A protein has these predicted regions:
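Membrane-embedded alpha-helices of multi-pass transport/permease systems
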Residues: 5-12, 46-51, 80, 109-112, ...
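Transmembrane-helix boundary motif in ABC transporter permease subunits
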Residues: 40-70, 137, 151-155
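Transmembrane alpha-helices
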Residues: 116, 123-126, 134, 148-177
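Membrane-interfacial helix termini and adjacent extracytoplasmic/periplasmic loops
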Residues: 16, 20-28, 61-65, 79-116, ...
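Periplasmic/extracellular loop-to-transmembrane helix junction in inner-membrane transport proteins
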Residues: 7-43, 58-63
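Short hydrophobic faces within alpha-helices
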Residues: 30, 55, 72, 128, ...
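Glycine-rich helix-loop "coupling/hinge" segments at transmembrane-helix boundaries
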Residues: 173-190
Length: 190
């Protein structure tokens, strides 16, 4: 009954000629949703790569603890995080006398909220890839004269490529599903 009645009503709308479908509007909103999710996933994975590489190769226990705390945003509800972002922006605007009205309903705040929310997903993907790499791989590149960044580029990044792509897909899908943050922080006329 819970399936048959809604499907029969929808089929009745289709066959009776009642159409609420506006393909131009659907394409427009789908394009912006996919663009926003792709941009958010890109920045989440970029920050995740940076944090995990630093925590694995160049950090002490305090830095590792801070990076662990950065991953706790996934436990917060999206609505609480969005309201917290608005309060944080208001605090910055009031006390530091920045004019952040351009950012208050913009993509920058939305992307930052996505980074805070989904950093745990990106970190988990990158960390699982880092754990598969032998610890001496980076040391070998440093011994052969490559600097840290060149060693990361030549040795680590090719080995992490599949984890980066999988983590990016997971974050992309999570951002597409995240309605509270998007609805509360979206730009006007979006």
């Amino acid at each position: 009954v819970g399936f048959v009645i809604p499907v029969s009503v929808l089929l009745n709308f289709i066959f009776s000629g009642f159409s609420i479908i506006d393909f131009k509007e659907i394409f427009y909103t789908s394009f912006f949703s996919i663009t926003l999710a792709f941009t958010g996933a890109f920045f989440v994975m970029l920050v995740s790569i940076f944090l995990i590489l630093i925590s694995n190769y160049k950090s002490n226990n305090l830095q590792k603890s801070i990076i662990f705390l950065a991953s706790c945003g996934y436990a917060l509800p999206g609505t609480i995080l969005a309201v917290g972002m608005v309060i944080f922006l208001g605090w910055i605007n009031e006390y530091l006398h920045f004019h952040l009205s351009y950012f208050a309903g913009g993509f920058i705040v939305l992307i930052f909220a996505y980074i805070v929310r989904f950093l745990a997903v990106g970190n988990a993907s990158i960390r699982s890839g880092i754990l598969k790499i032998h610890p001496n791989a980076m040391d070998a590149s440093l011994t052969m004269g490559a600097g840290f960044f060149r060693g990361v580029k030549i040795v680590i990044m090719p080995l992490l490529l599949s984890n980066i792509l999988i983590g990016g897909i997971l974050v992309f899908v999570d951002i597409l599903k995240e309605l509270p943050i998007t609805l509360l922080l979206r730009p006007f006329n979006f």
